[in-house]
Amino acid sequence: MLDQIRNSQSAIRNPLVECVPNFSEGRKPETIELIARAIESVPGAVVLGRHIDPDHNRSVITFVAAPEVVVDAALRAVTRATELIDLRTHTGEHPRIGATDVLPFVPVSGVTIYDCVALAHEAGQRIWQELSIPVYFYERAALQSDRVRLEKVRGRGFEQLRDEITMNPERAPDIGGHKVHETAGAIAVSARPFLIAFNVNLRSNEIGIARQIAREVRERDGGLPCVKALGLALYTRGLVQVSMNLTDYCRTSIGRAFLAVRAAAARRSVEIAGAEIVGLLPRAALDRQASYFPLLENFRETLVLETLLEAAEIERQTKGS
């Protein structure tokens, strides 16, 4: 078995793209299952993981596919989400502009970030042409310099965008008309390197504390480089959360981000209740000896991207033998 795992690593060198769509639904697992099935209806597209959060009312699906089919799989996901999710009745802690809120393409192997930019632009064109959902490009796929950062694109969310898109030229989409889709809103499409979504839960119900700490640790307010952060409430658990995106784990690791949040919480006499990884992460980003690791509430080996790719290749080899 060890030899099989070592040999299977060659699969990671084949052209492969990761796609990580985020959906504005976290309270109906059956909806996310239907979207996942739509993705896997494209031959060669494999769903590696899903994360469903009822407080955020948001879900993340991670799938991989060859570059020639990844856009088809992404379009099937967006199409199914458009059929199943009505943003007009959506409530949740996480900001959003669309039923499929974000659609990032990430190079895994045999493709470059520039290839993923082209895939993102192709997906955006098709989303407008086939679904009439206005499209904004961000990160490496951005067409405007002030739209590189997702928070600039998202603003205050769907309700604000619904009003502003019709009258404010600065809020016009990169592709599409000056009106959001009635039920699906808009969508932000990107190409980016690996991003790690890492949340730290605080033993407090004061949302102001989480927001203060988020401001303290995020880059845009003078905190850690390559860290985006929000303070959110977890009403079902009676906790608050510092929700972070680490856009370059080589510059700010999970451990460094955790220590910064823990120190900021300690200064406010607040204990850490736990932590979680959302979606998948590269093996190189994980430090099993770090202080955060025992506090991970949801860790399992299948959160490691390479583990899933290796297992998928072993299954493929077994079926072919």
Question: How should each PLM-predicted stretch be described?
Answer:
Residues M1-P15, K319-S321:
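Short, basic, low-complexity termini and linkers enriched in Ser/Thr/Gly/Pro
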Residues N14-G320:
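Long, contiguous binding/interaction regions
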